[in-house]
Amino acid sequence: MNGTEGENFYIPMSNKTGVVRSPFDYPQYYLAEPWKFSVLAAYMFFLIIAGFPVNFLTLYVTIQHKKLRQPLNYILLNLAVADLFMIFGGFPSTMITSMNGYFVFGPSGCNFEGFFATLGGEIGLWSLVVLAIERYVVVCKPMSNFRFGSQHAFMGVGLTWIMAMACAFPPLVGWSRYIPEGMQCSCGIDYYTLKPEVNNESFVIYMFVVHFSIPLTIIFFCYGRLVCTVKEAAAQQQESETTQRAEREVTRMVIIMVIAFLICWLPYASVAFFIFCNQGSEFGPIFMTIPAFFAKAASLYNPLIYILMNKQFRNCMITTICCGKNPFEEEESTSASASKTEASSVSSSQVAPA
């Protein structure tokens, strides 16, 4: 055994020398130099001061501008809400624990932070599933008379929360557990031990199958079919140029969101799966710390992608910030831009069925 397991923790270091201590009671500077903990604290501070404004602005701008309240935009707003849950529910505690060198909030605080981190990540993943299904239905048209409306959007939002809770809540009630990971300054699902007392092995398998593999399979299937359909439609000119351009813009934005999600979360999932499949193997604390903290950047990239790639939302945001005026919008292109970006809205209600 190359680690030390306690009642509520697992530290990736053997206690042969007797230096290993509980991450809830003592600084963990034997795992890494103090300056590395300071770097983690500074990183979390950056995510807080950068992530809160852009996610809050996403919500505020959509509330202020009625034309942004399109059905599928509700899913994008759902991502912003999930990001804010992560920012308020986990980031401050992670920053404070990194500053102190150990998890000062105890096992209860670890459960609290682990729950919100898992909940936010899963809402993000299942939101991308809903977006992928919407793109598939709208562009590929397997159901010719289907129109994505507000009711479908609310159902999609509800699905994301139900599935996220089905993943984040069980460790709080005895199926698996949340423990400090890596340098012991942030908490997540216990991938490190089998822990038969809480049936940890079955939960981790359930999580990887139901809450990671299946969602990604759905996403890849939808976009695989979508790419083929877009190419066929372009070749046959089945849609107007304006409609094709609008659908391409929306699809491109959502695909980039999926790629960004994979960049942020795939390293974490891969390392966690490796650790789980190699119980007791030797690995350093940095091995899990880097992907775990890198995954937290997910709270920042989604709103940035949305702002940068959705011209209608970007114009509304600039108008809100500039107190009702958009100094960057040319007068002669106002009419054309408005019609184009309105068509680019992530709402299938504006796309005529075949």
Curated annotation (Swiss-Prot):
Membrane topology listed for this record: Multi-pass membrane protein
Residues bearing PTM N6-(retinylidene)lysine: K296
Compositional bias segments (type: Low complexity): 334-354
S-palmitoyl cysteine: lipidated positions: C322, C323
Residue span of motif 'Ionic lock' involved in activated form stabilization: 134-136
PANTHER family (alphabetical): OPSIN
Family per similarity comment: Belongs to the G-protein coupled receptor 1 family. Opsin subfamily.
Function, in words: Photoreceptor required for image-forming vision at low light intensity. While most salt water fish species use retinal as chromophore, most freshwater fish use 3-dehydroretinal, or a mixture of retinal and 3-dehydroretinal. Light-induced isomerization of 11-cis to all-trans retinal triggers a conformational change that activates signaling via G-proteins. Subsequent receptor phosphorylation mediates displacement of the bound G-protein alpha subunit by arrestin and terminates signaling.
Protein name: Rhodopsin
Source organism: Scyliorhinus canicula
